[in-house]
UniProtKB/Swiss-Prot annotation:
PANTHER family: 30S RIBOSOMAL PROTEIN S14, SMALL RIBOSOMAL SUBUNIT PROTEIN US14M
Family membership: Belongs to the universal ribosomal protein uS14 family.
Organism: Actinobacillus pleuropneumoniae serotype 5b (strain L20)
Native organism taxonomy: Bacteria, Pseudomonadati, Pseudomonadota, Gammaproteobacteria, Pasteurellales
Protein name: Small ribosomal subunit protein uS14
Keyword Transferase: no
Domain of life: Bacteria
Amino acid sequence: MAKQSMIARDVKRAKLADKFYAKREELKKIISDANSSDEDRWAAVLKLQTLPRDSSPSRQRNRCRQTGRPHGVLRKFGLSRIKVREAAMRGEIPGLKKASW
């Protein structure tokens, strides 16, 4: 089980990313637009730098919904490989079965 502080930190980052998503996209659009002037671009870069660091989506970490484990998380299920295996062995995931060849 992951530390509760680490899970809470990721939840906080997700909330910040949602809050500043529109503003970040607007500034990024100005920066990448070839028609905008150099002054406008530079102003947008400076504004983007003033936003909270944790509002960037790339700072979020995929975590297991049950345990908070940060590694080996399968996106399709939102669970770590260990919990997916346990659920599959109990038959809780429809259509998923252990491979054999």
